[in-house]
Every structure is written in C-alpha cells, then in structure tokens.
C-alpha cells in the first residue's frame, strides 16, 4: 500500500443578509510539499455568481470553466441571468455524470438572485446542500469551529468578510497543507468582485 497523499486546501463560504462571501487560501501542495503559494481557488462566474473549491487545482479550473460557459450560453439564449440554484443543479449533474472518475474537488457555490443570497455546498459527486455557512478541505474542521461560534443569521457583508478571513487564518495556522494568502469573492446586488488578503507568517 502506498502512502496517503493529501491535496491541501481550505475554502469557506458565508451567507450574509445582503450578499455572499467565498474565501480560500492560496497554497498548492502535494502531501507536505508546497508547489506554489499563488494558487487560485476562488472564481467569479458572472456578476451574480462565484464558486470556491478545495481539491485538485486542475479539476477546480475545469469546473469553473464549464460553469462559466454554461452561464454565458444560458444568458444568450434566455436573455436573463440564471438563478443560483439552477446553476448549482447544473454543476451537480456535471459532477455526478463523472461519478466513476469523479472530479477531485468539493465546491461552494455562492450568489445573489431575485430570491436573495444563496450558499450551496457540493461534494465531489454533486450532492447539494444549501446552508448559511460552510468550510471545505483539509482545514475545514478548524475553520468551521470558528464559524459555529461566531455566525449570526443577520450578519452583514462586511462582517462576513472579516469572519471568512478569520476562519481561513485559523485553518492556515494549524493545517500544514493550507497557507499562502487569501482570495475572496464578494457577491451582492452591486455585482461580484475579487479581493486578496496578504498574510505574513511568523516562523
């Protein structure tokens, strides 16, 4: 039997009263070897939808590209933006269709539509769970303990951003295969935007 190798990543999603925040650390690792500290695990799909992921970078990028193309196609055909649940369901079908050789990625889908903000959690086979907050990846247990203690249903978008950064930092401090800086995707009625938080590690 070979030695188990972990693909490190930590991603967090928080639904606020006025939007959604997705966050992920930037380290790309193979086991305890760091390949890069500039990995992208947060992706803007359109101005109302974003995803964050934990797993293999290539699979994350492929899923983001597939979803972006399908959103563009829908908007051209129907002349309106798809709902968050509809795009999550589409991604679920795509992931389940690969169940014999699945994408090695857990996904957070976050966005805003006519019904308000949504956060949907997906496993590698495409199971869907809508929730108020979630954490994925090797640092998930560390991050979600902070979310459990701090989250409120009436949390504002600015408070959610701060909490997401704190949760990722908590994972980075203890999880040896998470690290680098933090990428954020913030989605509200004004659109979707990316932000970066640099972290200085003290050794």
UniProtKB/Swiss-Prot annotation:
Species for this entry: Pyrobaculum islandicum (strain DSM 4184 / JCM 9189 / GEO3)
Enzyme category, top tier: hydrolase
Assembly and interaction partners: The 20S proteasome core is composed of 14 alpha and 14 beta subunits that assemble into four stacked heptameric rings, resulting in a barrel-shaped structure. The two inner rings, each composed of seven catalytic beta subunits, are sandwiched by two outer rings, each composed of seven alpha subunits. The catalytic chamber with the active sites is on the inside of the barrel. Has a gated structure, the ends of the cylinder being occluded by the N-termini of the alpha-subunits. Is capped at one or both ends by the proteasome regulatory ATPase, PAN.
Catalyzed chemical reaction(s): Cleavage of peptide bonds with very broad specificity
Lineage: Archaea, Thermoproteota, Thermoprotei, Thermoproteales, Thermoproteaceae
NCBIfam families linked to this entry: arc_protsome_B
Cytoplasm as UniProt keyword: yes
Free-text function comment from the UniProt entry: Component of the proteasome core, a large protease complex with broad specificity involved in protein degradation.
Encoding gene, per UniProt annotation: psmB1
Protein name: Proteasome subunit beta 1
């Amino acid at each position: 039997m070979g030695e188990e190798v972990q693909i490190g990543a930590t991603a967090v999603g928080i639904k606020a009263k006025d939007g959604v925040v997705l966050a992920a650390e930037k380290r790309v690792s193979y086991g305890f070897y760091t390949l890069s500290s500039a990995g992208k695990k947060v992706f803007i799909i359109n101005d109302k939808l974003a995803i964050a992921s934990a797993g293999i970078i290539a699979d994350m990028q492929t899923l983001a590209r597939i979803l972006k193309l399908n959103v563009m196609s829908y908007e051209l055909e129907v002349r309106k933006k798809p709902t968050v649940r509809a795009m999550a369901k589409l991604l679920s079908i795509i992931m389940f269709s690969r169940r014999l050789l699945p994408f090695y990625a857990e996904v957070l889908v976050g966005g805003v539509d006519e019904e308000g903000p949504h956060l949907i959690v997906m496993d590698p086979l495409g199971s869907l769970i809508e929730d108020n907050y979630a954490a994925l990846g090797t640092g998930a247990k560390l991050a979600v303990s902070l979310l459990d203690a701090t989250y409120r249903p009436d949390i504002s978008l600015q408070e959610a951003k701060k909490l997401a950064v704190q949760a990722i930092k908590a994972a980075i401090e203890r999880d040896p295969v998470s690290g680098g800086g933090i990428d954020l995707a913030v989605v509200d009625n004004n659109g979707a935007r990316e932000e970066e938080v640099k972290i200085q590690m003290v050794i």
